[in-house]
Amino acid sequence: MKYLIRARLEVDGRVEKHDVIGAIFGQTESLLGSDFSLEELQNKDKLGRIHVELKYQGTKTIGSISVPSNLSRVETAIIAAMLETIDKIGPYPAKITIEEIRDLRLERLEKIKQRARELLRLMKEKEPDIREIIREVLQEEQAKAQVAKLVEYGPERLPAGPGVEKADTIIVVEGRSDVNTLLRYGYTNVIALGGAREKVPETIKRLAEQKKVILFVDGDRGGELILKNVLPQMKVDYVARAPEGREVESLTGREIAQALSQMKPAEIVARELGIEAAEKPAEEAVKREEEAAAEAKPPAPAVQEKAAKPPEEKPPTVKFTIPKAVLEAAKELRGTLEAIVYDKEWRELDRLKVRELYDYISKSEPGRIYAVVFDGIITQRLLDIASEKGVGIIIGNRIGNKITHKPTNVKFLTFSDLF
């Protein structure tokens, strides 16, 4: 707002705030035509909310009126003069007197000047110190020296990080340069194929039988060729790709983290490329099916010693059907970092960014949202607010590692459980 109109109010009787507001709108309506209708001006954000403060002195009412204005200086003066024409509030005579019209821009400019002076003093206080610069450079060099060193793993002497043996999940990349890049940013569970070779090294195949595998390739034609070569030969759980036209070795730490957060199940990537992925061990497939089924069922209630139920009384399985249109929408969400919220009839309520999802749910009325489908990570924080707001189903890209409590009233699944 540019200006603030401040006025003094005197009424020969006791009135309430709503009486004053009603008189302002009622007695100025059509006084100067539609261009100066207070209601229209507020709808267009030309006038702000009218604030009224009142106090009583005997049978009289005394107070102040504040009207923020985004109009021009002349138009603001006309509005102020129009307020002074109000001579009655409720059944009582009244008088409104304009005390001042403050230019809020001047106040902001004064704050800017004051803050600029403070910042200038701050800049002078922090003159560069050559000794401090030398110390920081030495610290940076020492930090670089502490980066994990590349090792040669297995009989094929494959370039790898020192954590590839102990890690539960490994990242498979193309070559030595890719390994060095990931090591630089703290990823020690990385191993290279040893270049664009036709046959996948046996060492990596053996690791894949014991660990989860993320295949991380370049975002170009070469990366696609590696996918077509590797996926049919060995078990791969997820596929991550560098941004389009970029190579893994050229990525920054943030770009690597983003690419890994957007990884897709290998089965989906194989279908997109029109190839057949290597089959996973039977026991792992069964485990995934059991986990997916478990997410669609409520956990059994705790058993109490004094009121134990007969073993044949098992909690019923809660079944729900996800419409085909919702499944198609979920597929299209991949890579968008967006979310869709639905009501109980699976009607779309809203579409928003994933970063806005938590606040959106927290501000919603309990029971309004039935299901959430989003291209992001299902976290404990999200499950807690969903449980509080009565959200029944959450479908995300993947589940976070720190889920310590599963709310009984929220079912959550991942994209890989559905397609």
From Swiss-Prot:
PROSITE patterns: TOPRIM (PS50880). GO terms for molecular function: DNA-directed RNA polymerase activity; metal ion binding; poly(A) binding. One of its GO terms (biological process) is DNA replication, synthesis of primer. Its EC number is 2.7.7.101. Mg(2+) 1 binds at E174, D218. Its cofactor is Mg(2+). It is an enzyme of class 2 (transferase). RNA polymerase that catalyzes the synthesis of short RNA molecules used as primers for DNA polymerase during DNA replication. Also part of the exosome, which is a complex involved in RNA degradation. Acts as a poly(A)-binding protein that enhances the interaction between heteromeric, adenine-rich transcripts and the exosome. Belongs to the archaeal DnaG primase family. Binds two Mg(2+) per subunit. Keywords: DNA replication, DNA-directed RNA polymerase, Exosome, Magnesium, Metal-binding, Nucleotidyltransferase, Primosome, Transcription, Transferase. Coiled coil: none annotated. GO terms for cellular component: cytoplasm; DNA-directed RNA polymerase complex; exosome (RNase complex); primosome complex. Pfam families: Toprim. Forms a ternary complex with MCM helicase and DNA. Component of the archaeal exosome complex. Mg(2+) 2 binds at D218, D220. InterPro entries: DnaG_primase (IPR050219), Primase_DnaG_arc (IPR020607), TOPRIM_DnaG/twinkle (IPR034154), TOPRIM_dom (IPR006171). This is DNA primase DnaG. The gene is dnaG. Residues 280-291, 306-316 have a biased composition (Basic and acidic residues). HAMAP family: DNA_primase_DnaG_arc. It comes from Aeropyrum pernix (strain ATCC 700893 / DSM 11879 / JCM 9820 / NBRC 100138 / K1). The keyword Transcription applies. It catalyses: ssDNA + n NTP = ssDNA/pppN(pN)n-1 hybrid + (n-1) diphosphate. It comes from the Archaea. Residues 280-317 are annotated as: Disordered. Residues 168-244 form the Toprim domain.
